[in-house]
Regions:
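…and closely analogous acidic/polar surface helices at protein-protein or active-site interfaces
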Residues: 26-43
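Short, flexible, mixed-charge acidic loops at enzyme active sites
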Residues: 63-69
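Active-site-adjacent betaalpha module
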Residues: 1-12, 38-46, 71-197
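Short acidic, Gly/Ser-rich segments with clustered Asp/Glu that frequently serve as metal-coordination loops
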Residues: 19-24
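Acidic-leg catalytic submotif of subtilisin-like serine proteases
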Residues: 12-18
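Von Willebrand factor
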Residues: 43-62
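Active-site loop/turn elements of alpha/beta-hydrolase fold enzymes
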Residues: 18, 55-57, 155
């Protein structure tokens, strides 16, 4: 596929739910962390914005969750002060990065992420996250509805359910997003726009 050249200054890489307590559910996450760290370096090096999204609850958030919500059973391990909710050190935020804390699945839900992106003139989003069927799927849909150009960094996403990641990246996401690899990201940000499918 051929994509339009991407202006790094109007692009943000969203690193979503790269938290210790979530990464632990995947087993071996080294390749995923390496891909995300490389993507962060590429985007940052080209003048793009990095954004971090993490799921974590404070006491008031726990009280506000309705009993029918899937989040009603979340325990203290997901409290905002728990080490399990911290962004992994291998991909840790730096000063000037966007950071938001959410209490639902999608990156835009319960956050001011959209406003922070718009304030910085961001029009293109590159998504990396865990899980593909959770935060990534929800954010692809929401970001497309908000008229962002959306790219999914396939090797920067993972899902604990076998086959789900492949199905979403091959069959569902291409309806609203371009699916790329970490190797293709550098070329896109340099302006060539050519991605072999």
């Amino acid at each position: 596929m051929t994509l339009p050249a991407i202006d790094p200054r109007r692009t943000a890489l969203l690193v979503m739910d790269y938290q210790g307590g979530i990464l632990d559910r995947l087993g071996d996450a080294e390749a995923l962390l390496s891909c995300a760290a490389d993507a962060i370096a590429v985007v940052r090096g080209r003048g793009g914005q990095i954004g971090y999204v993490r799921v974590a609850f404070d006491d008031a958030d726990y009280d506000a969750v309705p009993p029918h919500s899937r989040f009603a059973s979340i325990g203290p391990e997901m409290h905002s002060h728990s080490p399990a909710t911290a962004i992994h050190d291998a991909v840790a935020p730096e000063p000037g990065d966007i950071t938001v804390r959410k209490t639902r699945v999608g990156a835009f839900s319960t956050t001011d992420l959209d406003q922070q992106l718009r304030d910085r003139g961001i029009t293109t989003l590159i998504l990396a996250g865990i899980s593909t069927s959770g935060v990534v799927l929800s954010t692809v849909r929401d970001a497309a509805d908000r008229d962002y150009q959306v790219l999914v960094l396939a090797d920067g996403c993972a899902d604990p359910v076998p086959g789900v990641h492949e199905f979403l990246t091959e069959k569902i996401f291409p309806r609203q997003a371009s699916v790329i690899t970490g190797a293709e990201l550098k070329d896109l940000l340099s302006g060539s726009g050519d991605v072999d499918e």
